[in-house]
Amino acid sequence: MLRPLAGVASDSDLWFAIISACWVALLYRHVIGAAFVYDDVAQIQHNAALLSWHSAAQYARAAVPFNSEFRGFGGSFYRPLFWFSLALDRRLWGLNATGFHFTNLALHWLNGLLAFLLLKKLRVSVVLSAAVSIIWLSLPIHSEVVAWISGRSISLAVLFLLTALLSAEWYLRSSKIVALLGYAIACFASLLSHEVGILTLPMTCLLLYAANSVRRRWLVLSGLGLVVDALYLWLRHLAGGHLSSGIPVIVGSGTSFWKYVGWMLLPLRMSIERSTDVPTDNSPMMTAAAFIGVLALLIAILQLRSKLPEVAAGLAWLCIALAPFCGIVPIYQGMAERYTYVAALGLVLAIVGLLSHLKSWTRSLGLYALIFWVSWGVWRLNARVLDWRDEISLYAKSLEATPKSSVLLYNLGVAFAEAGDASKAAVYYQRAIDLNPRYTSAIINLGNLFQSQGNYSKSAALYKRAIALDPRDPDAWVNIGNLYLQLALNQQAKVAYENAIALKSNDVEAIIDLGAALQRLGDLSGAEQAYQRAIAVDPSQASAYCDLGALLLQEGNVGAAREELIKALEHNLSYAPAYFNLGALYEQTGSPSLAIEMYKKALDIQPDYQHARSNLERMEARTGTSTAKTRP
């Protein structure tokens, strides 16, 4: 049986901290230069709520809905500390992804350090504790949590989970109230970071059993854990959070368990999107075999708890950590590699603990096998980290592991579209639609491609198809509104934008576009109100100030127009239309040199800005100057 050890800091702690920090930096060095990918784009890059603490506070007041478009369960999550960590990084680093990645690496390193300290406290030898933590830090399956900025919620929750366990161990030794307070705070913080924090209480019970604690202290800690869990669930309910809807896939839970174990041991192919791995069509024989295997593992834990305590503790940790993610609790994505982050620590402890008890030649053989496995894992991790540096490579490699993922096909389409390869983008959008005919995002994006190519009939048909599938999708209405506006069907555009806003009242893009439609219809008062409303919804939206300035200029209110255009540039110094409209303003007020300067700035930012080019050429022809320097 494991026993708590008196808390004394030693040189080994400092040396491990230094060595493990260097190890994590070496393993993940290639990810530092990676850009925002996958959910990072929406959750960080385009998330105005991270710009201030006041706006970020909304995540403490309300849960965030989510759904995975393929085999998802829907639901919502309540993770305010995760969002606050992103807001802090946004304030420190702006939109420099390197800073966000540095935070992720620091969290992973701290978790390895805390795991080392916890094992030492439980009288696991320094060598074994260091080996377990170093190996755990280098597992390739953790690349999703560490390299993906949005995967931080789990590593942040685990930081507090391990802190809670260290506080619990301290309380078992000392009975100090401050230790109990630290335990409660860490438990709550873990839950507010990610739902994986719910594991803190069962892990505490495992610690109490392993430490053979005094009954009274056992009751105090477990009771406090229950109170914290209840408080979190109540707060989550008040914020509108709820578990994913759907039927738990308990029948396939055994198969899911062994899939997770396989990913941890031999992640030959890895994927950022594992929703299609949820076992739904296994044969009865395979399902029964998986359950029998889990049952045999539980029996082995009971048999080994006295002879091989580290092995038994590691396997028990593994089972507890995986249980919620094996279909027992409905999860929006079903399965994911990041859900192994906690469980893998138990698996490594069991492997290293077993090796330490082997004798003679079997120990040497086991050691060689362990070295080979760890070395292969480091090589595999390096290859996977390189995938994270390139968005297309990340999705393509993930698709090899999960070829039936319509989400990955869609993301590949987006990546190729952003890279300017419209033909490949169309192919992947169509493949996503073929797999999931109700995938409205892919249908809309394919419509966008056809619209950009001038194929308006196909584009309109796709937008209408998306609306027919989901009339409550505001994006579909916005996109068909944009098409109508491009075709000068201004009344139809107005109706489409109004439908979008009715579904999503804070859709700034739809509100601004409604203003443009109203302006074309001659309703200048309505257009001005729309632009003002957009500014009220998002005061940082440069395009709203710019469009309002252009409208005021059209009305002859030059002073007010200039103020709005200057505000647009204050919010986005690289917004070319604001310079263009300032050029038009200066041209209108008889300041040709200033007009030329503004048109040139617009072209410096956007060389293919044809309206700016034609205005510049006209002004320079009038003043006798040359446009040579402005040609792309």
Listing of model-derived features with the role each one plays in the protein:
Residues 588, 593-632:
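Terminal, low-structured helical/coil segments at or just beyond the last alpha-helical repeat
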Residues 398, 431-432, 465-466, 499-500, ...:
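Canonical positions in the second alpha-helix
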Residues 409-416, 428, 442-456, 462, ...:
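TPR/Sel1-like alpha-solenoid repeat signature
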